[in-house]
Regions:
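N-terminal anchoring/stem segment of glycosyltransferases
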Residues: 1-99, 122-127, 184
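Short His-Asn-centered micro-motif
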Residues: 6-10, 37-40, 112, 133-135, ...
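Short catalytic/ligand-binding loop motif for oxyanion handling, primarily in non-cytosolic enzymes
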Residues: 14, 44-47, 62-63, 139-142, ...
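Short acidic-hydrophobic catalytic motif
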Residues: 102
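GT-A fold catalytic core of metal-dependent nucleotide-sugar glycosyltransferases
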Residues: 105, 109-161
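Conserved glycosyltransferase catalytic-site signature
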Residues: 114, 136, 177, 210-211
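Short beta-strand-to-loop element that shapes/binds the nucleotide-sugar donor at the catalytic cleft/hinge
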Residues: 149-150, 154-176, 181
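Catalytic core and acceptor-binding pocket of nucleotide-sugar-dependent glycosyltransferases
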Residues: 179-211
C-alpha cells in the first residue's frame, strides 16, 4: 500500500505546534508513507527533507478566490451577524447552535482543508490512499504500515474517526475530521472530490444546512 499523507497549518503557527506534529510523522511513519505539507506562507526553513511542500496559493487559486469573496461576510465566517447582500443560514436549521456564532458555518476557515484534499487527490498517481492528518497531531511511537492498512480498508471510499455514542442517540453528529482517508481505488472517490470542490467554486456550499 502506498499512502500520501497530507496536512496544513494556519500561517504563523509553524513554530508553536505544526513543526512538532509534522516532524513526529517523519520520525514515526514508515517509508511507504510520503508526507506533503500545504503552505500558505513562505516555506519553513527548518522543514525536514522527507516532507514535500506545496504552495497552496499557487496550487489552488480557486480557494483564494472563494476566501477573498467571502472574507468580509461575517455569516460566511461562522458569525450570526448578517450584512446586506451577504449569505444566509438555511431557514430549515434546527438545534441549539442555529442562533449562535459557531464553527458549523465557518465556511471560509474550513475551505482550506477542502482544497488541500482536492489538490492531493488530483495529483496522486501511484498512490492507493490520500490521508489527511491535522498538523497538531503528535505521533508518539512508531506506526507500522500494517496499522495503516487496517485503518484504510480497500472496500470503503472514506475512512474517518467517528464519535458515535449510543447513549446520546445522535448518530455521531460531529465526527473527528483530523484523520480522514480517501481511497483512490474506489470508483466514486474522484466523483466525490469533484462534487466537494463544486460546493465552493460557485458558492453552493451556502445552500446546505451546515458549511
Amino acid at each position: 500500500m502506498k499512502i500520501k499523507v497530507i496536512t496544513s497549518y494556519k500561517p504563523g503557527t509553524w513554530g508553536s505546534f505544526a513543526k512538532r506534529g509534522i516532524h513526529s510523522m517523519v520520525e514515526q511513519f514508515p517509508p511507504e508513507v510520503d508526507i506533503f505539507l500545504y503552505c500558505e506562507e513562505q516555506q519553513p526553513k527548518d522543514v525536514d527533507d522527507r516532507i514535500t511542500c506545496v504552495d497552496l496559493t499557487q496550487a489552488e487559486t480557486e480557494l483564494f478566490k472563494f476566501k477573498d469573496k467571502y472574507k468580509d461576510d461575517p455569516t460566511a465566517n461562522g458569525k450570526i451577524k448578517q450584512i446586506e447582500g451577504g449569505v444566509r443560514r438555511s431557514p430549515n436549521l434546527q438545534g441549539l447552535d442555529k442562533d449562535k456564532d459557531s464553527f458549523l458555518w465557518d465556511a471560509v476557515r474550513f475551505a482550506n482543508k477542502v482544497f488541500c484534499v482536492v489538490n492531493a487527490v488530483r495529483n496522486s498517481d501511484g498512490y492507493d490512499y490520500v490521508l489527511w492528518i491535522d498538523a497538531d497531531t503528535f505521533t508518539f511511537r512508531s506506526v507500522p504500515l500494517e496499522f495503516f492498512s487496517k485503518l484504510l480498508p480497500e472496500e470503503t471510499m472514506l475512512t474517518y474517526l467517528g464519535r458515535e455514542n449510543p447513549t446520546l442517540g445522535d448518530g455521531g453528529v460531529y465526527p473527528e475530521c483530523g484523520f480522514v482517508g480517501y481511497n483512490l481505488k474506489h470508483p466514486e472517490t474522484r466523483n466525490f472530490i469533484h462534487d466537494w470542490e463544486r460546493l465552493y467554486t460557485p458558492g453552493d456550499v451556502f445552500k446546505i444546512l451546515e458549511w
